[in-house]
């Protein structure tokens, strides 16, 4: 008797491949799905071939599911429009909420499949998400906006694995050896080299403008506001500057960037919108990560209406509007919100 049916998101990479192998060994009836999300040249032909190889090895059914229209509406356009507004979006978080753990779950429903799995490095007990054992690969941050209703259906077998062990496991299976040595995929799947190249397909991003200080005085020049994010310290000119200067604000309406020394980036409190919590909380203490690769900082959160105020016990640097703040209680993810 099987543990139930599970739909595994297969990308052609080692993580999703080993995920499918492990779940089958654990007694699940596995089906795979390859999700076509964008039109990156040559991307899908190669990966679909790898997915079919995995399906043949495991003798499982695999589906090719075109979600490019939904991805474009929920992720790609959000990415482009956010940069137009001088914001710094996190497309991976929105993709996880709307596509991988939104549309993929809906697709599982049409197939009569109870569980959904991916090769993400994190853990889930059906009620909460937890950080992975491999701290360097932990991806729990990116699921802070996933709807709590889907948590009981999610499986993440790599949450207790170390990345090197995953590669070694694949290398010991003759048919899957090539998966162990292939290059890691990029963080943002539709970006080939840099986000600038994506934006340049839709608008003119090379618009030289003024660099100003916090008092509004013109102190230099820059190459176009969409080239910058909060905290960036290169790519613009400041007259007579001896200390490093950083972007501390972006003004798209005037094509200006505001710069200052590092202490100007310091923030002790901020607000979030689009609050997503895995339990009913109104006012609570926890830790918050304001970017993926940052340390969690203790804080106090108070929710009022559709927004929450986050007061920090120590300052953070480089808060960027539209980035995601993920809330933790130790390794347990409580949810998150979008910085505003």
UniProtKB/Swiss-Prot annotation:
Regions annotated as coiled coil: none
Classification via CDD domains: MnmA_TRMU-like
UniProt-annotated binding residues for ATP: 9-16, 35, 119
Reactions catalysed: S-sulfanyl-L-cysteinyl-[protein] + uridine(34) in tRNA + AH2 + ATP = 2-thiouridine(34) in tRNA + L-cysteinyl-[protein] + A + AMP + diphosphate + H(+)
Cross-referenced PANTHER family: MITOCHONDRIAL TRNA-SPECIFIC 2-THIOURIDYLASE 1 (PTHR11933:SF5), TRNA 5-METHYLAMINOMETHYL-2-THIOURIDYLATE -METHYLTRANSFERASE (PTHR11933)
Molecular function via GO: ATP binding; tRNA binding; tRNA-uridine 2-sulfurtransferase activity
Keyword Cell division included in the entry's annotation: no
Taxonomic superkingdom: Bacteria
Subcellular locations according to the entry: Cytoplasm
SUPFAM superfamilies recorded: Adenine nucleotide alpha hydrolases-like
Signal peptide feature range: none
Species in which this protein is naturally found: Sulfurovum sp. (strain NBC37-1)
Disulfide bonds: 95-189
Protein name: tRNA-specific 2-thiouridylase MnmA
Primary localization class, coarse: cytoplasm
Gene: mnmA
Matching InterPro entries: MnmA-like, MnmA-like_C, MnmA-like_central, MnmA-like_central_sf, Rossmann-like_a/b/a_fold
Keywords, sorted A to Z: ATP-binding, Cytoplasm, Disulfide bond, Nucleotide-binding, RNA-binding, Transferase, tRNA processing, tRNA-binding
Active site per database record: 95, 189
GO cellular component terms, A-Z: cytoplasm
